[in-house]
């Protein structure tokens, strides 16, 4: 209902503007829409825009998005060079750009920065359907008229402008999916787009999309401090091992409205609106077996026996809703030689997780005397651990022996709002030393407020008289692991049990609110030489932020902090033309990434040392410096009819990287701490990389009429250095895949348009398991470094154009059924193994 109200409000607004339109006889020539028909044409359109840009940018244009089997924005951008994607439930979620993780990149919608529904700065992109977008532009170099935020780069999503329409547009799309694991075909996805220039001076485009998708997935994993080594050098399981089963329905709904009004030949106004909602309705079962008391004589390179095994059967049910909404109003006009643009934006993101229960039941086998064992674990296949229970552990197979261990009701509400005003001025009639020059200058003010309110209620004591047998234990019927020991409490019955604990008392221990204001000024000149274009200038941003929270959740113990800092960033982008087809690029620019909100927020548990005005404990660090990067780019580009080749090299020198650390005898936020577990700027990092891109229409070179190929790869190397009391430690740069590659082979002729797309990403350091401990002063335990294994996927798209208006489409995703694998330090030490299966999609499209 609320989305219907939104729609009616927007359509009413559209009608109001239309009815108030000027009746002047002045007419403006319409801008013809660039129509890209077929996969090959749309790829060439993106390359043409890339060639014309004065920056290093990769572009996915219009219909090219629909020609990949990519449901979300994250999966679409993974096709570009320098981009890798972190997956969740088999779908792309966070984008890593040139080794920079999601929180170190800027994400914008039609020029307005997009806030993050989660607690940090990284924007999850698996909830943004590609049907709402017209193009995606990934900027790898920045100019002074762009925000400095994002040491990796800037990802810009754009919706279609009504002024680009030459005639009315009406499109329908309907798809359904089949997944190997869910076995369900009830996965509808439909979208609708309508747009028109209703008069010579007013046009509007409306888009709507909805998808409901059933997902079944399985994984097995081991926890932190997972593997030990015996005296013979054999590894053995030193912690818990668990199998997980996920059954969820993922629903996406979104709409866009774009309106353009040309008031006069040199004055126009526009309005952009985007709303996107993402709902996860999830049931998760966890079958966990904690190994203790290893029989040392039984340890081999692939197995070990244990005399104590604790079994936990955990069931979780939650409904999580995320929303992103952007509202933009702007315009442009001219006063003589001065061109003026303004933009006002209001962006909002929210994550609501207030329907969440987690229940755990426990049983145990323990041999206190004698030689009996509870069971033997085997890791001959490091990706699948297997357990054989001994007769002494028969209770672990009996649901009636499982008693209540934990019952938690979690809740959370994260809200993030950013308001911004942007003013840009431009004069094209300048000359400097007889060289034409465009002078630009501007100002931007933005204010951002983010709050985090999370907590939980422990109901274990109240539920303790009941055991699992009281909650109708059952075994999931789509359990695909080689081993099945699982029986679990009915999640619906557990979900109903939470009602006796509501309403919940507010838990303030994790509450914080941060306000951030940024004032930015820039000056930029574009020089147009006979054989070169040079864009040079400087941007300065001043940041002021304040944050507050409660020490250990005590409403009477408020912690307030504030801080101001500035950053000045010169930049230069040069494009030099060797001939009509060949150009060279070079650029230098500075950028920053502000600390994460959770890293600076006063999520605190601190206490005074016996009236000494000295404190100890744990807290965020409001004194953190932002990441700062100096960036260099050089590239060679060749564009010919039906053939494109580019090669580039980039380098990033990064200061003030942020990691967890325990500090001693330091003042943080005006408070002196004898010991504080917090975050700190530690050491420096650097990244060096090469990017190669190739596009060829094969019928120009081979007797392969209608065939084409596209290939890109990024080879990079990066590291982070830490100076500690035990010396200097060097590790790979976090989230950086040293090798990324995409290969597309396609056929586009007549009524058939098909493409096979291959995506490869090498392994990368996921995170340090030591985080939150004395990471830098006690040194690294390299066995606790988690890596994400390499990933290779095959996707197939085939479209048949039945008529000018009607087409049919088939998509196959993850056709090789490639799993996601994570390991501790070496690939034979399991951390996590996920399987999602392949997905097939069938659909119809109608346009008028």
Residue ranges and their predicted role:
Residues 73-76, 93-96, 108, 124, ...:
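N-terminal periplasmic accessory domains that precede
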Residues 182-291, 312, 320-330, 336, ...:
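Transmembrane beta-barrel wall of Gram-negative outer-membrane proteins
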Residues 699, 760-775, 799-848:
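C-terminal beta-signal and adjacent terminal beta-strands/loops
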Residues 74-113:
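Extracytoplasmic beta-strand/coil segments of soluble accessory domains associated
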Residues 35-66, 94, 102-105, 112:
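N-terminal periplasmic "start-of-domain" segments of outer-membrane beta-barrel proteins
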Residues 308-326, 506-519, 563, 592-654, ...:
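Outer-membrane beta-barrel signature, preferentially recognizing the C-terminal barrel domain
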Residues 112-140, 192:
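Short acidic/polar hinge/loop motifs at secondary-structure boundaries
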Residues 651-654, 665, 671-770, 816:
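Gram-negative outer-membrane beta-barrel transporters
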């Amino acid at each position: 209902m609320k989305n219907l109200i939104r729609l009616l409000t927007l359509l009413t607004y559209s009608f109001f503007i239309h009815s108030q339109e000027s009746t002047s006889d002045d007419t403006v020539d319409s801008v013809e829409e660039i129509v890209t028909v077929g996969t090959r044409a749309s790829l060439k359109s993106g390359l043409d825009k890339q060639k014309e840009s004065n920056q290093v940018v990769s572009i996915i244009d219009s219909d090219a998005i629909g020609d990949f089997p990519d449901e979300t924005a994250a999966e679409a951008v993974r096709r570009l060079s320098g981009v890798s994607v972190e997956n969740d439930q088999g779908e792309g979620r966070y984008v890593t750009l040139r080794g920079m993780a999601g929180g170190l990149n800027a994400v914008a919608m039609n020029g307005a920065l997009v806030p993050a529904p989660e607690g940090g700065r990284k924007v999850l992109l698996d909830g943004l359907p590609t049907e709402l977008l017209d193009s995606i532009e990934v900027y790898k170099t920045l100019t002074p008229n762009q925000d400095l935020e994002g040491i990796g780069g800037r990802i810009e999503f754009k919706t279609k402008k009504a002024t680009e329409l030459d005639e009315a547009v009406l499109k329908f799309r309907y798809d359904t999916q089949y997944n190997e694991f869910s076995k369900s075909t009830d996965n509808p996805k439909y979208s609708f787009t309508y747009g028109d220039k209703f008069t010579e001076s007013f046009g509007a485009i409306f888009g709507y999309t909805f998808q409901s998708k059933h997902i079944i997935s399985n994984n097995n994993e081991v926890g932190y401090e997972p593997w030990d080594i015996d005296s013979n050098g054999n590894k053995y399981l030193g912690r818990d091992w668990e199998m997980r089963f996920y059954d969820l329905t993922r629903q996406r709904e979104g709409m866009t409205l774009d309106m353009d009004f040309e008031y006069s030949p040199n004055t126009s106004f526009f309005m952009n609106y985007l709303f996107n909602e993402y709902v996860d309705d999830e049931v998760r079962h966890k079958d966990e077996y904690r190994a203790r008391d290893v029989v040392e004589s039984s340890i081999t390179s692939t197995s070990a026996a244990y005399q104590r095994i604790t079994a936990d059967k955990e069931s979780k049910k939650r409904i999580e809703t995320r929303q992103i909404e952007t509202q933009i109003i702007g315009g442009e006009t001219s006063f003589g030689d001065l061109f003026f643009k303004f933009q006002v934006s209001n962006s909002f993101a929210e994550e609501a997780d207030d329907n969440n229960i987690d229940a755990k039941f426990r049983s145990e086998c323990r041999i206190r005397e004698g030689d009996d064992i509870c069971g033997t674990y085997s890791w001959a296949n490091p990706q699948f651990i297997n357990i054989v229970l001994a007769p002494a552990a028969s209770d672990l197979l009996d649901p009636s022996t499982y008693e209540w261990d934990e019952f938690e009701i979690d809740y959370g509400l994260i809200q993030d709002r950013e308001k911004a005003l942007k003013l840009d001025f431009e004069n094209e009639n300048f000359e400097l030393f007889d060289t034409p020059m465009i002078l630009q200058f501007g100002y931007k003010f933005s204010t951002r407020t983010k709050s985090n309110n999370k907590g939980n209620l422990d109901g274990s004591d109240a539920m303790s008289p009941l055991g699992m047998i009281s909650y109708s234990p059952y075994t999931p019927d789509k359990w695909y692991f080689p081993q099945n020991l699982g029986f679990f409490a009915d999640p619906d019955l557990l979900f109903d049990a939470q009602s006796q604990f509501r309403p919940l008392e507010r838990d303030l221990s994790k509450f914080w609110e941060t306000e951030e204001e940024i004032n930015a000024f820039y000056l930029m000149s574009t020089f147009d030489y006979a054989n070169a274009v040079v864009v040079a200038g400087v941007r300065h941003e001043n940041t002021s932020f304040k944050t507050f929270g409660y020490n250990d959740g005590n409403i009477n113990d408020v912690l307030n902090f504030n801080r101001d800092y500035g950053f000045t960033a010169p930049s230069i982008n040069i494009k030099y033309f060797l001939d009509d087809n060949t150009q060279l690029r070079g650029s230098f620019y500075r950028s920053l990434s502000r600390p994460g909100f959770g890293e600076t927020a006063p999520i605190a548990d601190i206490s005074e040392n016996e009236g000494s005005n000295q404190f100890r404990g744990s807290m965020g660090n409001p004194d953190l410096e932002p990441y700062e990067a100096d960036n260099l780019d050089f590239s060679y580009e060749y564009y010919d009819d039906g053939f494109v080749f580019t090669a580039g090299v980039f380098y990033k020198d990064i200061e003030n990287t942020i990691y967890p650390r325990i500090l001693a005898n330091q003042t943080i936020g005006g408070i002196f701490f004898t010991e504080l577990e917090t975050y700190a700027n530690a050491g420096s990092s650097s990244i060096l990389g090469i990017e190669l891109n190739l596009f060829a229409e094969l019928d120009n070179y081979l007797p392969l009429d209608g065939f084409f190929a596209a290939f890109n790869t990024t080879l990079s190397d990066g590291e982070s250095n830490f100076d500690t009391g035990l010396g200097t430690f060097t590790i790979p740069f976090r989230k950086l895949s040293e090798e990324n590659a995409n290969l597309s082979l396609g056929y586009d002729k007549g009524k058939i348009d098909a493409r096979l797309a291959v995506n490869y990403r090498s392994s990368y350091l996921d995170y340090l398991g030591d985080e939150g401990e004395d990471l830098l002063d006690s040194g690294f335990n390299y066995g606790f470094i988690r890596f994400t294994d390499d990933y290779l996927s095959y996707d197939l798209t085939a479209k048949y154009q039945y008529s000018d208006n009607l087409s049919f489409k088939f998509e196959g995703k993850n056709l090789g059924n490639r799993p996601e694998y994570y390991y501790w330090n070496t690939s034979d030490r399991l951390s996590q193994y996920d399987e999602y299966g392949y997905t097939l999609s069938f659909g119809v499209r109608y346009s008028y």
